[in-house]
């Protein structure tokens, strides 16, 4: 191997060489490759491409030219790097989903939002867009400095005039050495309004600037969640902006829904987003999606359709998609740009200040250039005027001269002309000697004098120059400004939960005997008069019926207490919303019940962390327990123990209390005991409890409720055969915990055993559910008020083998208050006898007809007389029993 000549070998320490070479490389990447200039918002490769297009005359009014021709010209003259890097930069400037205001007008395949690459440069064509001309306008009027290209044979601009704020309009992104930039695009109208406000008030604050510039405006539209990230980025130059797709939930028939995505976040690859959704569905991380397809087209724009299973909650699925897929992502703002050739982190105001200063410089240099040109032209015109005034002498002098040089010198000496003036006279054509041409020269000269005065006035007064900048920016705003694409949604979105996407509304959750659960809007049911047939609430399976019902808000917690004394928790919206006739979904799909475990009580709670509330439990054997609500704030999906009891016992009911209530416990044989809650010592979550009521043989607890000490509430009793009544709470005296209680109704074959004992105010509605799935909604005020021992009046007519399975209270809403009360009318026949009364129950729910029931008045009167007699006998029997107990 031949040795290298000694003169070409330079021995250096490797550490020093690596340090210096890396610094040189790093500085080259920072200042000449990866970071944009704060003035025109362009990196060198983009600036060279646009300048090359301008030099080749590829303006919007000219035909397209091959991309390969553009790339080759730029690479050969200005950018000695790979042709693919130049082409990729040009392609990006042509993509309307990458640039808010594209700078290249491409023809052919220039890629897609799915990450598809552009066609080869030999196939595509390009030219400048109209707005690009504003970046290059006045570039030939000495408005910017030119520098040598890489080999010194060409000149290229160091910066473009940039007649609009391109740095913020189209944004920028790039990775340098030790730093990176990521600037979001903005709306041109808002940006120019911000620059105008800054020009009028240099001390303007960023908060005031944000009145003009709301926030980033992405080319793919979408949503921005909140303004806190925007404000932080504008104030410090760094911040995180939450972006979200625009998605709507559509009905697709048969009670099914679909999620349709029409806008996606900026820089999100649509194809990868769809793949991510499919992956989550395949891995069972998101449940309820049956189909996923991309229906995007040139006609419809972006359209990604996600079909949702009938029993799934589309809103919750959408929220999960936001959390786990690029449907929602963040844009990390890092506003680093080159300021005076050095990288600097800038905020919003600094970016606008530097741009405004650049525009003032451009306009000033352009004015100076125009002034020089105007003065030069005026100087020539002055020479022509002299020549016209002495035309004969001028001609004689020229004729006497032997050469052009002699003629020029003679003209200069004789008429005191400059070299340029003398040359202009020599170049003047004979036709300029006519009178008409003389008038034109005079007019042009006078116009030039006025123009020179205007230019000098601009240069003499900074405010006049600034107003010229404002006028030109306003003109650009009016020509190219457009409406915002990205919507900014205000609100706290930093820690999004499921309920943030779900409107808060009153709902009804029903649970069937075979553990099928669903939810419905409470407005599904309308108030009816007592005695009505009701509304079909669900189509139950064979031997199944609605066993429990509770009303709550979609944002409330639902605590599920089981017969085995365990507790589970769901949010209201987590229960699928289904049609009124749907049977629901198996409850085991929502909560993880153990074998042979049945839900005995559902209650709604807004704040599980409350220290002022308690839960009171009652078991079938008469055991009660009080426990702080906060003991149940952390419930796992597999549940926790809520109360312990003997094997032959089970949990009947749970109530939420304030700690100062009276406890009412009712039994199936119509016994009721009332005692102060304060007599119950708070116990731990897994404690057993104490005796609440002493039960007679064959009796069991069926109801638990609470009332205030001086309550004007009433005790509502409903029996299994559809009878009910109201009795004032104060008719039930306070007694010691553990007693046998007092009678609250007379049990006969006619009305049956008690199925519900609860307290009411008279301002609620009552929802009664039968084992056949029929639901009726009544105004509690329509139910008769009777004594403790009365049997009650008929609330709902039952068919064969039907019985009341559950009862729930519903708060009256505005819709029910506006409903017209259905009237029961009584008519008298011509012979004076009272005809049968007909109660018409109007079910206004769509798809249901008017139901008509015949009520026998004689039967009702007889029932009333029997109730009065029975009430008297029961009171006598109670007094005798009480005396025996006291003895």
UniProtKB/Swiss-Prot annotation:
Disulfide bonds: none annotated. It catalyses: ATP-dependent breakage, passage and rejoining of double-stranded DNA. The record marks 84 as: Confers resistance to the antibiotic ciprofloxacin. One of its GO terms (biological process) is DNA-templated DNA replication. Residues 811-864 are annotated as: Disordered. CDD domains: TOP4c. Residues 35-501 form the Topo IIA-type catalytic domain. The active site is at 123 (o-(5'-phospho-dna)-tyrosine intermediate). Its EC number is 5.6.2.2. A motif (GyrA-box) lies at residues 528-534. One of its GO terms (cellular component) is chromosome. The keyword Nucleotide-binding applies. Residues 813-823 have a biased composition (Acidic residues). Few gyrases are as efficient as E.coli at forming negative supercoils. Not all organisms have 2 type II topoisomerases; in organisms with a single type II topoisomerase this enzyme also has to decatenate newly replicated chromosomes. Heterotetramer, composed of two GyrA and two GyrB chains. In the heterotetramer, GyrA contains the active site tyrosine that forms a transient covalent intermediate with DNA, while GyrB binds cofactors and catalyzes ATP hydrolysis. This is DNA gyrase subunit A.
